[in-house]
Every structure is written in structure tokens, then in C-alpha cells.
């Protein structure tokens, strides 16, 4: 099997619904680490989530305690981000899963693949930075990241 730029572009399209407005950012499949929570807090930079957006990160109990100890948990709460321990997105159902959410965004390829079948919602997939920006603006980028852009015929890199 050869994975080329066309395959990467197709995979990105498969993991991204044809809608950019989101309702939920879902981080933590598998559980988010303390480093990821700290990165989210840093990327938020004092901003808050868009009024329409639910932002939920799932973590292990030890990460929840560490985030509470170092102040990250408070920074996330002030930004409108909920941190929930001891659950995984692949097992969350309503009412813990926000019933009004119709489109979610995640940085997890695993959850981007399974979410439609598990929760019946449309999905957007992106980096942690993309997820944070979508939480603030209410919309995901409409174009793929550079790694998922198709190369025009004749411009392919060669292995030499």
C-alpha cells in the first residue's frame, strides 16, 4: 500500500463534513493529557468560547487533579471549557453529550472516524489549534491543512 498526497487529501475529506459551523469541540479520545490541557489554555490566550459552542475535554482523574493544582483547570473554566474525568468520547451519550450539538470538531482521528456512527452528528477534524480557533469563532476552516492538500499533476515530489 502506498500512501500519497491524494490518499491523505481523500482521508481528510472523509473525516470532514461539508459544513463549517460547529456546536461542540470534543477533545480527549483517548483522554487528553495535562500537556494538551495546558496547550489549550495557552492557545485560548484569555479568549472565551463562542456563545454557541460547548467545549469539553475528557481526561483521567490524575490529569484532572494536576490541572486543578497548576491552575490550568481554572484557566479552562474561565474560557468556558469543561473538563470531565473518567469518560471517553466513544462512550458518551446524551445528556452528557450536548443534545443540541449537531456538528462537532475534534483533534482525534479515532473519534472523527467513529463519531458519526456513535452519536449521529457531523464531524470536523483538525489540529488542536484548529479546534481552539473553531471554539472561539464558531466555525472550522473550510479548506484542508497543507498536509492534506492534493498536489497538481506534474508537481509531485520524487524520491531520489
Name what the model sees in each region:
Residues 12, 16-19, 44, 48, ...:
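Structural signal for hydrophobic packing residues in well-ordered secondary-structure cores
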Residues 30-33, 48-97:
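Extended C-terminal subregions enriched in glycine
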Residues 77-131:
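Extended, charge-rich low-complexity interaction segments
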Residues 112-160:
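Extended hydrophobic packing segments that form well-structured cores
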Residues 1-58:
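A glycine- and small/hydrophobic-rich beta-loop-beta segment
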Residues 38-41, 73, 77, 129-133:
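Predominant activation on well-ordered alpha-helical scaffold segments within soluble catalytic domains
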Residues 38-39, 69-70, 117-118:
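Short amphipathic alpha-helical segments
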Residues 19, 49-55, 86, 143-150:
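Flexible, glycine/charged-enriched surface loops at secondary-structure junctions
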Amino acid at each position: 500500500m502506498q500512501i500519497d498526497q491524494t490518499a491523505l487529501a481523500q482521508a481528510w475529506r472523509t473525516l470532514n463534513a461539508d459544513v463549517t459551523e460547529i456546536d461542540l469541540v470534543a477533545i480527549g479520545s483517548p483522554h487528553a493529557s495535562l500537556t494538551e490541557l495546558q496547550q489549550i489554555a495557552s492557545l485560548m490566550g484569555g479568549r472565551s468560547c463562542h456563545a454557541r459552542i460547548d467545549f469539553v475535554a475528557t481526561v483521567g482523574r490524575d490529569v484532572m487533579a494536576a490541572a486543578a493544582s497548576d491552575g490550568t483547570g481554572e484557566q479552562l473554566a474561565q474560557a468556558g471549557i469543561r473538563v470531565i474525568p473518567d469518560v471517553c468520547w466513544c462512550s458518551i451519550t446524551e445528556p452528557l453529550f450536548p443534545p443540541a450539538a449537531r456538528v462537532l470538531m475534534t483533534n482525534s482521528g479515532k473519534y472523527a472516524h467513529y463519531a458519526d456512527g456513535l452519536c449521529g452528528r457531523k464531524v470536523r477534524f483538525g489540529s488542536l489549534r484548529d479546534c481552539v480557533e473553531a471554539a472561539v469563532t464558531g466555525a472550522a476552516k473550510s479548506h484542508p491543512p497543507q498536509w492534506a492538500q492534493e498536489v497538481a499533476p506534474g508537481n509531485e515530489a520524487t524520491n531520489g
